[in-house]
Amino acid sequence: MKQQLLLLEDVDGLGRSGDLITARPGYVRNYLIPKKKAVIAGAGTLRLQAKLKEQRLIQAAADKADSERIAQALKDIVLEFQVRVDPDNNMYGSVTIADIIAEAAKKNIFLVRKNFPHAHYAIKNLGKKNIPLKLKEEVTATLLVEVTSDNEYVTVLAQGKQTEENQEG
């Protein structure tokens, strides 16, 4: 039998702080109550619910302003990657989300995997790509990633072929 609860914190997939929700008893007993993420709804929780919703609105406004500021700053950022390619400009491997996060950290832009709505996103060809990011309060941003070839490897291959042809001829 499901129990009615008042969430004290945002819980992914369940609700936001101040929401009245229902959940299964095991989830309530083993996770929500011990982690202090919810309280069992009763007559006294209505005042607490109003207070939590007011706090959530204030926090949401601050988060949205921060997210919009971050989105504006990300418009001017270009992350550049040089990758090895074969003579036909086919990449060896790909540029993954982990690569993007690491390169962004070098520029003091700290992203986490949950910022990327497409978790298995990988760039597998050369060129410029706009990567969508999901920030707080449903604010979205785009990050420009430019993938170029590392011509050294292609040059080494071409020189190797030329020396083979010279030795044959």
UniProtKB/Swiss-Prot annotation:
User: Per its UniProt record, what Pfam families does this chain match?
Assistant: Ribosomal_L9_C, Ribosomal_L9_N
Any one GO MF term held by the record is:
rRNA binding
Q: Which PROSITE patterns match?
A: RIBOSOMAL_L9 (PS00651)
The protein's matches in InterPro entries, at most eight in alphabetical order, are given as: Ribosomal_bL9, Ribosomal_bL9/RNase_H1_N, Ribosomal_bL9_bac/chp, Ribosomal_bL9_C, Ribosomal_bL9_C_sf, Ribosomal_bL9_N, Ribosomal_bL9_N_sf
A cellular component term from Gene Ontology for this protein is: ribonucleoprotein complex
In its keyword annotation, does this UniProt entry include Ribonucleoprotein? Answer: yes
SUPFAM superfamilies reported in the protein's UniProt record: L9 N-domain-like, Ribosomal protein L9 C-domain
- Which keywords appear in this protein's UniProt record, sorted alphabetically? Ribonucleoprotein, Ribosomal protein, RNA-binding, rRNA-binding
Decide whether keyword Ribosomal protein is in the record.
yes
Q: Which GO terms describe its biological process?
A: translation
| NCBIfam families (alphabetical) | L9
Q: What does this protein do?
A: Binds to the 23S rRNA.
Q: Which family does it belong to?
A: Belongs to the bacterial ribosomal protein bL9 family.
Tell me the protein's name: Large ribosomal subunit protein bL9
Taxonomic classification:
Bacteria, Pseudomonadati, Chlamydiota, Chlamydiia, Chlamydiales
